[in-house]
Every structure is written in C-alpha cells, then in structure tokens.
Design a protein with these regions (language model features):
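Short glycine/proline- and charge-enriched loop/turn segments
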Residues: 126-128, 177-180, 227-235, 319-323, ...
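Binuclear metal-dependent hydrolase catalytic cores centered on His/Asp/Glu-rich metal-binding motifs
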Residues: 224-246
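Histidine/acidic-residue-rich catalytic or RNA/ligand-binding cores of hydrolases
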Residues: 116-117, 226-227, 272-278, 282, ...
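Glycine-rich phosphate/diphosphate-binding loop of Rossmann-like nucleotide-binding domains
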Residues: 220
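C-terminal non-catalytic regions of proteins with extracellular/luminal or membrane-system context
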Residues: 1-18, 55, 156, 285, ...
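Conserved, charged catalytic cores of large soluble enzymes
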Residues: 377, 384-409
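Extended catalytic-interface subdomain
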Residues: 265-272
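N-terminal beta-rich core of secreted/periplasmic extracellular enzymes
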Residues: 2-216, 248-263, 281-351, 367-388, ...
Length: 604
C-alpha cells in the first residue's frame, strides 16, 4: 500500500487499537473529519463519478475533495455489475487523500419491502421472508443461516457493512416498521439477534465478517399513535406503561454478541424518567444521557455509533420535502445540531455529506481534535477489524470467494442453494390462524379461483377458473394502511388504521357465500381480521412470500410452522386503548402472540 496514511506499513501483529491510533495520527484533520460522515449514494454502471447526484455532490467530490470513506448504497446496478462499479470507486479512494478504502453499507436487500429509507426488495440475491417472518418461525439455527447467506452475498458484491439488524419491539400495532423487526417479545428478539449476529459477523468481527449496525437504540416501537418519526407528526416516543427496559433487552444481547455498530432512533422521548432522572426531550441521537450515559457507560458499548440518516440538514428529494429529523432541536442551526450530536456521543453522521460543518466547529473551538480523533479511531479500527487494510484490493474479499460467487444462477450472486432456502423459509413462516376441518392442505386437483395470485404459481393439477366455475378460492390481500404522500418516503410507509375498508370485507364475504375461501393476509402490520375470521374457510398470515411459496404452504409441500410474532388486535378501539411501549397488551386480542391454529398459543 502507498500513501502518507498507510506507509510506512504497520505490522498486522501490532495491537489493533495502536494501529488505528497511528493511522489517525498520520491523517490530516480534514481527512479525519471525512470519516465522520456516512451519506447515501446511488451507483450506476458504468459508474459516473463526475455527475451530481439527486442526493447531492458528485461521487468524485465526496471521495476526493471531502475525504468521505463510508457510503450507504441506495440504488445499485444489476448484481452482475455491482462489483465492477464498487471496485472503480475503491480505486479512486486508494489514489487520493488518506488512501483509506471505502466501506460500503446497505439497508436490508433480501426480502420483499421496497422502501428507499429502510429496505430494498431482493434483486439478484436470495429472497427471504421479512425479519418478522423469521420471528414467526422462531428457529435460531435458521436465523443464523440467514445471517451467513447475507454475509456471503454482501461480501461477493463488495459490501462490508449492514445497516441492520433492526431489533425494535413491535409494541405499537400501527407502527410502520414492524416487518423489519423480529416481533413484540423482548427475549425472543434477543435470542434471534444473537443468532443473526453470529451468522453475519461470525464469532468475532474479522476479515470474513460483515459489520452489523444494530438499530434503533434504545428501541423504536413505542411511537405515539403509531406514527413514524421519519415525519414531524411521528416524532414523539412515549412510555405510559413504564416498559422502557423491555426495549433494551435485545440491545443488551446484541452488545454481548459484539455488534460492530449501533444506530439510535429518530424518536424523541416524552415524559421519560430513567433511574430517577428526567430524560431530555430531544431525538435519541442528540441525547447525551442516552448515548453516553446509557449506551456507552451503563451498557459498555465501545463500537461505532452511527446516527440515523438526515438529522442535520433539510432536503428535497425527487421533488418531495424531507425536513431534518432534528426532533426537539428544530430551532438549532445545522452546525449547532452537529455539535449536539457529537456532544451526545455519536461517531458518524448518517445521511450527511458536508465535513465543512465539523471543520468550522473545530475552527471555532467548539469541538476539539481529541473528540474528532476518538471517533475517527473507532472508524479506522472497524476497517482494520474487517481486514480492509490488509488486502491489496482494499475490500477484504478473497479472490476465491469472488470466483465462487460468479457461479450463481444467471442474474444472481446467490447460489441455487441459498435461493431455495429463502423460498422455503417464506413458506415456513406462514401462520395458519384458522382452518375448517378438511380444507388444508389443498388437494392436487382442484378447480380454483385465484385472486391476486399469479396463475403460473398453481400446481399442474389445478384448473384456474372464473369464480362461477370454481370449487374453492384462494385470495391474497395486504394489511390495510392509509396512503400518504406529502413528504419523501411517506408513500413507502404503511401507517394509520389497521382496519380493512368495507369494500374489501364485503367482497371477500360475497365470495365466501359462493364457495370456501382460503384467505392469505400479508401481515406487514397486525391487521384487524375480526370481520373476516369467521367468514373464510381458512385464514393464513404471511410475512413476505412469493405466490409459489404461498401455494407450497397451502398444499403442504412445505409445512407452514409460523406462530404470530405479535398479537392481532380485535378492533381499532382496542389498539387506541393500548400502551405503545407494552408488548401484547391490546384488550381481548383476536389472536394472541405465539398463536397458530396448529398448536395453540405456546411457542415451542
């Protein structure tokens, strides 16, 4: 390796903290500050390094002029071209400034939900149920295997940091982010996050690992009225049930398992007392009591604290406003918000790309270089732990692994084995809520009416027919939500009422009067199924499944072993009367947490 930062070389046998400090000491102040930023970028093929991005400056400016070395990947090219594009950016980073390589991160990419601020629909990698579906299966070995699959796919693509797992508890039924959690039970989530981190990072963080960013500390989920804190109307996080500590349980497990990084949530705690002290009502990342006092000192976390994205600067993205999520400090200027974040104990600013803000604070004497060095050292240490400074290509991927990845199916980085595992897990996660005797499994020869399922998914023996010719119907519906589209990302968030529109209910009831109906509901949130549960012949929940996986579960080709990872409320009135911070506390739920019609409500 060449460059003022990395030469003369420091022996890999030297203590990793000493190596990190030595490298930081060799860097200019501007290069150190560049490490403290983690913006999102869009990457095409071929990569256009000189074109301005919809999110800000060109890639060349970010890498060369601003010295940024951590990037979250938003839109990317087809997987066959990702590696080449990222290698081009690595070469640019290696030729300038600190010569440190880039750490590319990503939101989840292995499931169904496409939300540019939270997750990406699987494309070229194996497709699994949403994490809530893994929570429904409840198999630690499978979750560990899933982590290993994600690790292999990311490494093959050149991605070395995951902005997941999300281990918030699904305690407010209306909240939009439940599908990416493991469910409402604290201990269950803790077991699964341990297994996931073992798969993603390995026993110890090292050259074979993907660095995990566990989120959203100290637990999203207790949102007032279930509204999402990406938006001003959802900024308040409340604890009327006094269950703050429940939400820490999975984070304690993640810290014990060695998570590389932790991301605080956007939410602003309201009326929260902790150990006899009133917690300041500002967004979690701005809160020194919770980041330094709780996370660093009480819980002993010494990894990277990466803020959630967009806490400092207002933005307009694709023509939609996206105000900074600076809840409780909206009155502060961007530079004052940056100072608050570093005072709180944050190491890196997610979604921000302007190091001049920190450089100005240094010039003013409002942040000293020792504070910058502490965070920069953590970020260099992470690169060292991942082996990025010990590989000639700077991303820690062995050639053999890259060659193996090229052997996947056409258009896929994943192996056929991984693809099959993901599809099978989609079926396994499905949860039978009710079934009349003799309905399931569906037989091999049927005249069936399919609604919102592709006819191509039907088995060879089925005749897909119009309703008047059918002996049974299989219907898919998604969980209800209220469409909104004022702010960027708002249209991607399923929020509001969990009750189905009467036209949906009436349509299913009318069909059920003519023939038995097997109703499959995608439970991205805990839908109110009370008007339908006694009407249909079988009621089944899925947590992210393709049509073929749905049919495989309904025909018994794969056994649907899922149990509800959250309860299904009986009514919206019951939801409104519940406490947002308390797991599974709606009055007289239609189905309790852990329920399956094939085994009651006791999780095995």
């Amino acid at each position: 390796m060449t460059g003022t930062t990395l030469s003369p070389a420091i022996s890999s046998s030297t203590d990793i903290d000493v190596r990190a400090r030595t490298i930081v000491e060799r860097m200019t102040v501007a290069e150190r500050v560049g490490l403290l930023f983690h913006p999102m970028i869009f990457v095409g093929s071929p990569v256009e390094v000189d074109q301005p991005s919809p999110l800000g400056p060109s890639l060349r400016e970010l890498i060369v002029e601003r010295g940024i070395r951590y990037f979250c990947l938003g839109a990317i090219p087809p997987v066959a071209h990702v590696r080449e594009a990222l290698d081009d950016l690595q070469a640019l980073a290696r030729s300038t400034g600190s010569r440190l390589p880039i750490v590319f991160s990503t939101d989840p990419r292995h499931s169904f939900v496409q939300n540019d601020g939270a997750s990406h629909r699987a494309d070229g990698v194996s497709q699994w149920p949403e994490p809530i579906g893994l929570g429904a299966i409840g198999d630690e070995d499978l979750v560990r295997r899933f982590g290993e699959v994600v690790r292999a796919d990311y490494r093959a693509l050149g991605i070395r940091m995951a902005l997941h797992p999300q281990i918030d508890l699904a305690t407010e039924p209306r909240w939009a982010r439940q599908a990416q959690s493991f469910g409402a039970d604290p201990e269950h989530s803790a077991r699964l996050v341990r297994a996931y981190l073992e798969g993603l990072q390995g026993a110890h963080l090292g050259p074979e690992s993907i660095a995990a960013t566990t989120k959203h500390f100290p637990g999203g989920g207790p949102q007032k009225d279930g509204e999402d804190p990406h938006f001003v109307y959802g900024r308040e996080q409340v604890y009327p049930g006094g269950r703050f500590e429940d939400h820490l349980v999975p984070f304690r497990a993640a810290i014990e398992a060695g998570t590389a990084a932790i991301m605080p949530y956007y939410g602003m705690p309201v009326g929260l007392d902790l150990h006899g002290e009133r917690i300041e009502e500002v967004g979690f990342a701005f809160n020194r009591q919770l980041i330094t006092g709780l996370l660093r000192e009480r819980l002993g976390f010494d990894g990277v604290v990466l803020s959630d994205f967009g806490l400092v600067t207002d933005a307009t993205v694709f023509g939609k406003p996206f105000p900074a999520r600076a809840w409780g400090v909206e009155h502060l200027s961007p530079i004052e918000r940056v100072r608050r974040l570093f005072d709180a104990g944050v190491d890196q600013l997610g979604g921000e790309n302007d190091p001049a803000l920190v450089l100005e604070l240094i010039d003013r004497g409002e942040i000293d270089t020792a504070r910058v060095d502490a965070s920069a050292t953590r970020l260099v240490r992470l690169q060292l732990q991942l082996g990025l400074l010990d590989e000639p290509d700077g991303d820690g991927r062995a050639k053999a692994e890259g060659d193996a990845a090229a052997g996947g199916a056409d258009g896929f980085v994943a192996s056929p084995e991984h693809i099959a595992l993901g599809i099978r897990a989609q079926s396994q996660a499905m949860t039978v809520l009710t079934e009349r005797e003799g309905i399931l499994p569906l037989g091999p020869e049927l005249r069936v009416h399919l609604r919102d399922l592709a006819p191509a998914a039907a088995p060879a023996g089925w005749q897909v027919v119009a309703p008047e010719d059918a002996e049974i119907a299989v219907v898919r519906v998604g969980a209800p939500f209220e469409p909104r589209d004022t702010y960027f990302l708002e249209s991607s968030m399923e929020q509001g009422s969990l009750a189905f529109d009467t036209t949906v209910v009436d349509g299913i009831r009318a069909l059920a009067e003519r023939m038995p109906v097997v109703l499959v509901v995608t439970l991205s949130r805990p839908a109110i199924l009370t008007p339908l549960a006694d009407t249909v012949a079988a009621l089944v929940g899925d947590f992210g499944a393709g049509d073929a996986a749905v049919i495989a579960a309904l025909t018994g080709e794969v056994e649907p072993v899922g149990r509800l990872p959250f309860e299904l409320p009986r009514s919206m009135d019951a939801v409104r009367r519940s406490s947002p911070d308390v797991p599974s506390d709606t009055e007289d739920p239609l189905f309790p947490i852990g329920w399956s019609a094939r085994g009651g409500s006791v999780r095995s």
